[in-house]
Amino acid sequence: NYTHRTNSVTQVGASLLPIEEKIHYCEAVYANYHTPSIFKISPLIDPSFDELLAGKGYEIQHVTETMTMELSQFQRYPSVSAEYEYYGRNSGLPSFVVYPDDVIVQLQDRITDEWITSLFRLNGTTNPTLRRIVPSMFKAIPKETIVASIEIDGRMVASGLGILDRGHVGLYAIYVDASCRHKHYARAICSTILSEAQKKGITHAYLQVVQGNAYAKSLYRSLGFEDLY
């Protein structure tokens, strides 16, 4: 979520700066926005960093698991039909993909203010600071995106976001309204994003899921995802 995965400090490589200096800098940035300092710990980094943070009073607040898939192993959810606008519009994406039981996934090639506002309502984001910061985070994504939604009577009841980068697609913002669970909405959203990414030459997919979310993990495994760590 925005407080943890999306809004965390992630180590991406070695640095010549002293680790204490980097921690202090990150803490100052978070303090400026009146939000808690969040550091992401993964098996890919030096375990001593985890120990260093623990020594400073940091605690584990949120645990996620990473899943990956080679799209050659993708088990797609068969669609019924797709509707395209004129050639070149929407970055070649269909405007609508129809699934059984009249489930219609809408696609856009960019993140709009309307989609973000609907996402906040869908995932229950009410914190004023997050509602102010998160839109700029979405708008700052420098990569190609596949933005998905399902609407009922003009109201978004399911969402998904695919971010394409160097042969990989990441699945983000997979949410379904509580009143619409068990209708294959999440399966339709994920399958649509993965299918369209594959058409664009993407060969691998990844996602993160909250530890203990057995229903989501079952869905992702049925699509072909496997645990990485």
Task: Outline where the language-model segments fall.
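A conserved beta-turn-beta hairpin within the catalytic core of GNAT-like acetyltransferases
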Residues: 2-8, 61, 164-171, 181
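Acyl-donor-binding surface of acyltransferase catalytic domains
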Residues: 17-113
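Conserved acetyl-CoA-binding loop-helix of GNAT-fold acetyltransferases
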Residues: 19-27, 176, 182-195, 199, ...
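A conserved beta-strand-loop-helix scaffold within acyl/acetyltransferase catalytic domains
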Residues: 129-177
